[in-house]
Amino acid sequence: MDNRYPIGQFNCPSEVQEKDIQMWIKEITTLPSRLHALTVSLDELELTKTYRENSWNVRQLIHHISDSHLNGYMRMKLALTEDNPVVKTYEESEWAKLIDYELPIRVSLQLLESLHERWTYLLKNLTATQLQRTYQYPDGSIMRIEQSIALYAWHGNHHLAHIQQALIRTK
């Protein structure tokens, strides 16, 4: 197993079924509680553990998930209100060096809980037409909202697995 991708790399589905969307929305919905359950009792030393050499630590992973999912939510809202908008990318590794990544993880866990409540309410109420709306990355690649739902469900599970790996590595 490649510990960079403990659940495998993301494979963007070309065709999406309604049952897939419902499963991904459920994963997005439950991510904050799954993260909270896994990390609520961690001490400072455990928060500094990494899942592999030179990787982000548990604290950085939690703050990153919050940042990334905030961006994902905004990308979807842009796609719903504009015609195939070009979305901005960001330097994730540089964001992880900013001072707010030193905050207690409860700050990002609270943000994720509120964000995911709004996000999943939106997702559960999208029409079939809205699920087909798109946004575009600066490189020209296009993502449908239904594919983006798959991406962020995978993303949350991907980093949850990283945190699990880091905590196993600490024992």
Swiss-Prot record:
<comment type="function">
    <text>Possible metal-dependent hydrolase.</text>
</comment>
<dbReference type="GO" id="GO:0005737">
    <property type="term" value="C:cytoplasm"/>
</dbReference>
<dbReference type="Pfam" id="PF12867">
    <property type="entry name" value="DinB_2"/>
</dbReference>
<keyword id="KW-0378">Hydrolase</keyword>
<comment type="subunit">
    <text>Homodimer.</text>
</comment>
<dbReference type="GO" id="GO:0016787">
    <property type="term" value="F:hydrolase activity"/>
</dbReference>
<keyword id="KW-0479">Metal-binding</keyword>
<keyword id="KW-0862">Zinc</keyword>
<feature type="binding site">
    <location>
        <position position="64"/>
    </location>
    <ligand>
        <name>Zn(2+)</name>
    </ligand>
</feature>
<comment type="similarity">
    <text>Belongs to the metal hydrolase YfiT family.</text>
</comment>
<feature type="binding site">
    <location>
        <position position="155"/>
    </location>
    <ligand>
        <name>Zn(2+)</name>
    </ligand>
</feature>
<dbReference type="InterPro" id="IPR024775">
    <property type="entry name" value="DinB-like"/>
</dbReference>
<dbReference type="InterPro" id="IPR034660">
    <property type="entry name" value="DinB/YfiT-like"/>
</dbReference>
<feature type="binding site">
    <location>
        <position position="159"/>
    </location>
    <ligand>
        <name>Zn(2+)</name>
    </ligand>
</feature>
<keyword id="KW-0963">Cytoplasm</keyword>
<protein>
    <recommendedName>
        <fullName>Putative metal-dependent hydrolase BH0277</fullName>
        <ecNumber>3.-.-.-</ecNumber>
    </recommendedName>
</protein>
<dbReference type="InterPro" id="IPR023774">
    <property type="entry name" value="Put_metal_dep_hydrolase_YfiT"/>
</dbReference>
<dbReference type="GO" id="GO:0008270">
    <property type="term" value="F:zinc ion binding"/>
</dbReference>
